[in-house]
From Swiss-Prot:
Disordered: annotated segments: 49-68
Disulfide bonds: none
Key words of the record: Ribonucleoprotein, Ribosomal protein, RNA-binding, rRNA-binding
Protein name (record): Large ribosomal subunit protein uL24
Pfam hit, one: ribosomal_L24
Superkingdom, natural source: Bacteria
Organism (species): Phytoplasma australiense
């Protein structure tokens, strides 16, 4: 996967794509990547695709509870936010000193440091 945990991504598709700001304008929703599932090509983004989980009563809890948690979304529905230009961009791969280096295709900025 070309996106890593902790990076900020923009949501490109789905029910959580937009939010309305204080001026009434539609803005693209962004969030930090919390977890990556490589086999399924899905990621969990902070505050996006919230699901309601019902917990039944158990021996420890007399009452059941309802919690909200993030659901996964497909990797094709997000784009990395370029740290320098703050715009959504695709990610390309270059080889430098025998190592793979990621770069933003829109601005040509290098995303990884050469070790």
């Amino acid at each position: 996967m070309r996106i890593k945990v902790g990076e900020t991504v923009a949501i490109l598709a789905g029910k959580d794509r937009y939010f309305i700001d204080e001026n009434g304008q539609r803005k693209v929703k962004t969030g930090k990547v919390l977890k990556i599932f490589n086999e399924k090509q899905r990621i969990i983004v902070e505050g996006v695709n919230m699901k309601t989980k019902h917990h039944p009563p158990s021996k420890d809890q007399e009452k059941g509870s309802i919690t909200k948690q993030e659901g996964s979304i497909h990797i094709s529905n997000v784009a990395l936010i370029d740290p320098k230009t703050q715009t959504p961009t695709k990610i390309g791969i270059r080889f430098k000193k025998g190592k793979k280096i990621r770069y933003a295709k829109k601005s040509n900025n290098q995303l990884d440091d050469i070790v």
